[in-house]
Amino acid sequence: NNKDMALKIKDECVNNGVEAITVQADVSSDDDCKNLVQETINAFGKVDILVNNAGTTKFADHSKLDKLNDEDFINIYKVNVIGPYQMIRAVEPIMKENGFGSVVNISSIAGKTGIGSSIAYAASKGALNTMTLSLAKALGPEIRVNTVCPGFIGTGWFENRFGKETFDRIKKDQENITPLNKAGTPDDIADSAVFFCLEGAEHITGETLISDAGMHLN
């Protein structure tokens, strides 16, 4: 939902010789999902790869159940679960027609371990992981569906949410407690997503790849 950042990244792509477009969409809206796919087809003629990277959450102490209500769950699931489903449904016809498609869902270790910003968030990511399995079975052989589960990722959003001091402390903690002594970066997750789209991953579907410097082992 950061228009300025999207335009900045588009400019970086264009400056590096890559064709790029920006389309604003709310993935919880089925009409927006369909329009996003159609705009992509209009620009490039096809869709080979879909990365479902939109997400939302609410921060709530797991031990305080009254901090979440039904609306919180619905709002989180609309973006984190229904959104990816609607995007995949929108690209299915063109991918099937072309005989090829790779879908990468960006989930979280919250969906594997139960940790995270809230129980609703962790539950939504667990649902996304399970949906990956179901869709991998349903959409083959033309379309492969896989998932990347990041741990802590140092992003501007995270820093803006907590402030630089808290952000730096959390990042340092990650560097100290993870087996690889590393805090994750957006590039780490991008590399994992790209892997699933390369020729070397053509034999892989329904897989969940944890990319968290070993954080889930603690």
Please provide the spans of the model-predicted regions.
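Substrate-binding pocket helix/loop in short-chain dehydrogenase/reductase
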Residues: C33, D61-L65, N69-I74, Q174
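Short C-terminal tail/terminal secondary-structure segment
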Residues: T57, H62, T113, N176, ...
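Residue(s) in the substrate-gating loop at a strand-loop-helix junction
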Residues: S108
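Active-site helix of classical SDR
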Residues: I88, S124
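Short, flexible catalytic-loop segment of classical short-chain dehydrogenase/reductase
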Residues: C149-N160
